[in-house]
């Protein structure tokens, strides 16, 4: 039996981050986490591009454009959607999730879901580097691993 898996060596790979500006004070912490993960695993700063979009809903389109460019081993999507008093949260979360998954499937480039979806601001803060780790860091790690796995198949 042959086991296929990726490693966490990011050297000589280029990655893109797409970040939603809405709730920027949280998203900036997610970006910091992603950059930390990339740096710790050998990705040079010059091999990371960051694209800002207005909010989470706009992330899939830019992620698709970046993935289709052929320049990147992976694309990390970072944003924050916090539940409010209306059903808007449910629509945004559902469509962004589907959009990001479809981009990855359509382009065969790892497009990683690093969107923090929470019930309240406290939960979002926890997932941006306090109690619950940093989901940006986790997303960058997944991008590195998936990029290497795809190379091994």
UniProtKB/Swiss-Prot annotation:
Chain residues that bind (2S)-2-hydroxy-3-oxobutyl phosphate: 85-86, 127
Protein name, UniProt field: 6,7-dimethyl-8-ribityllumazine synthase
Taxonomic source organism: Clostridium perfringens (strain ATCC 13124 / DSM 756 / JCM 1290 / NCIMB 6125 / NCTC 8237 / Type A)
Family (UniProt): Belongs to the DMRL synthase family.
A GO cellular-component term linked to this record: riboflavin synthase complex
InterPro entries: LS, LS/RS, LS/RS_sf
Annotated PANTHER family: 6,7-DIMETHYL-8-RIBITYLLUMAZINE SYNTHASE, 6,7-DIMETHYL-8-RIBITYLLUMAZINE SYNTHASE DMRL SYNTHASE LUMAZINE SYNTHASE
Entry EC no(s): 2.5.1.78
This protein's encoding gene: ribH
HAMAP family: Lumazine_synth
Disulfide pairings: none
Catalytic activity: (2S)-2-hydroxy-3-oxobutyl phosphate + 5-amino-6-(D-ribitylamino)uracil = 6,7-dimethyl-8-(1-D-ribityl)lumazine + phosphate + 2 H2O + H(+)
UniProt KW Transferase keyword: yes
Binding positions for 5-amino-6-(D-ribitylamino)uracil per the UniProt entry: 22, 56-58, 80-82, 113
Active-site residue list: 88
Reported function: Catalyzes the formation of 6,7-dimethyl-8-ribityllumazine by condensation of 5-amino-6-(D-ribitylamino)uracil with 3,4-dihydroxy-2-butanone 4-phosphate. This is the penultimate step in the biosynthesis of riboflavin.
CDD domains xrefs: Lumazine_synthase-I (cd09209)
Annotated keywords: Riboflavin biosynthesis, Transferase
């Amino acid at each position: 039996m042959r086991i296929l898996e990726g490693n966490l060596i990011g050297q000589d790979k280029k990655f893109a981050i797409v970040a939603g500006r809405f709730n920027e004070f949280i998203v900036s912490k997610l970006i910091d986490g992603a950059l930390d993960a990339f740096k710790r695993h050998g990705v040079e700063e010059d091999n990371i591009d960051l694209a800002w979009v207005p909010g989470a809903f706009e992330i899939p389109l830019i992620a698709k454009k970046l993935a289709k460019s052929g320049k990147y081993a992976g694309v990390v999507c970072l944003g924050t959607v916090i539940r409010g008093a209306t059903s808007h949260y449910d629509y945004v979360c559902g469509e962004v999730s589907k959009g990001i998954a479809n981009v990855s499937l359509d382009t065969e480039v790892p497009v990683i879901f690093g969107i923090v979806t929470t019930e309240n601001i406290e939960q979002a803060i926890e997932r941006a580097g306090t109690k619950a780790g940093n989901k940006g860091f986790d997303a960058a790690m997944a991008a590195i691993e998936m990029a290497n796995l795809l190379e091994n198949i």
